[in-house]
Swiss-Prot record:
This is Cyclotide cter-B. Probably participates in a plant defense mechanism. It comes from Clitoria ternatea (Butterfly pea). Keywords: Disulfide bond, Knottin, Plant defense, Signal. InterPro entries: Albumin_I_a, Cyclotide, Cyclotide_bracelet_CS, Cyclotide_sf. Residues 61-135 form a propeptide. The lineage of its organism: Eukaryota, Viridiplantae, Streptophyta, Embryophyta, Tracheophyta.
Length: 135
């Protein structure tokens, strides 16, 4: 009987420890995308909006929010001209959060225009599009 009780105690301890770990990770500011970019760039998480900073992949808006100058990352910008000057694109897209003072450069005109059109859309139009896609 004692071994079964110890087994359950270990299982409960494991579940409590993992729930604490995941709770802490969700509340941290600037949580990395759980990928390293020491030798290769962010690959899998790049599709989720992550870029390399200090050899760790971070979400793009976190990099832009924590930046003190535009020189901290090659894709940070405040205007389209900044993207041209840095050679990182031709369109500077702002983030939805107005507390983020820098935008993000896009290389292709097509991506920039799509994002620009999306940002101009009203929420009801976005819902119509998502309903049409779901059908």
């Amino acid at each position: 009987m004692g071994t079964i009780a110890r087994y359950y105690a270990h299982v409960v301890l494991f579940l409590v420890a993992t729930s604490v770990i995941f709770t802490v990770k969700k509340t941290e500011a600037g949580v990395p995308c759980a990928e390293s970019c020491v030798w290769i760039p962010c690959t899998v998480t790049a599709l989720l909006g992550c870029s390399c900073k200090d050899k760790v992949c971070y979400l793009n808006h976190v990099i832009a929010f924590e930046a003190k100058t535009m020189d901290e990352h090659h894709l940070l910008c405040q205007s389209h001209e900044d993207c041209y000057k840095k050679g990182s694109g031709n369109f500077c897209a702002p983030f939805f959060n107005h507390d983020v003072k820098y935008g993000w450069c896009f290389r292709a005109e097509f991506e920039g225009y799509l994002l620009k059109d999306f940002l101009k859309m009203q929420p009801r139009d976005i819902l119509k599009i998502s309903k049409a896609i779901a059908k």
